[in-house]
C-alpha cells in the first residue's frame, strides 16, 4: 500500500510539473482575444494531448527513449519559437485579428507542441513500468485545469495591456521555446 501511495504522489508531482509548463504557455496564449468557449476547448484539447502523448511514449518504451527524449524537447522548442514569432509579427500588422487562431489545425498544432514534453516523460515512465491509467489520467487532469487557469489569467491581463498583449504573449512563447532548446 505504501508503494502505491508513493507512486501516486510521484505521478501527481510529475503531472503538476507538466501542467505548470502548460500553464506558463497558456498565460501567453490567454493574451489573445479568446472567448470562454475557446478557453474551454483549448484546455480540453491540451489535456487530451497530455493523455495521448505519454500513452504513446509509454508504449514506445525503453528502446527509443534515448533517441526521442532530446529530439522531442528540441521539436517542442522550435514549434513554440515559430508560434511565438507568428504572434509577435501579427501584433505589428494593422489587421484586426491574428494569423494564429486557436481552433482547428492551429489548436492541434499548439496542443501538440505543448505536450511534446509529456511524450518524453511517458517514455521514461514506460521504462519503469508506471501505472498507465493513473499516469495518463493525472497528466490529462492537471494539464487541462492548469491550462484553463493560465488562459483565464492571461485573458485578465489582456485588458490592461491592450494592443501590446499579443506581442507579449508571443514573447512568452519565444522564451519557453528558447528554454526548451537550450536546457
From Swiss-Prot:
Membrane topology (UniProt): Multi-pass membrane protein
Claim: Transport is one of the keywords in the record: yes
GO molecular function: manganese ion transmembrane transporter activity
Originating organism: Geobacillus thermodenitrificans (strain NG80-2)
Function (record text): Probably functions as a manganese efflux pump.
Classification via Pfam families: Mntp
Cell membrane found in the keyword field: yes
A GO-annotated cellular component: plasma membrane
Family of the protein in this entry: Belongs to the MntP (TC 9.B.29) family.
Entry keyword set: Cell membrane, Ion transport, Manganese, Membrane, Transmembrane, Transmembrane helix, Transport
PANTHER family according to UniProt: MANGANESE EFFLUX PUMP MNTP-RELATED
Subcellular location as annotated: Cell membrane
Protein name: Putative manganese efflux pump MntP
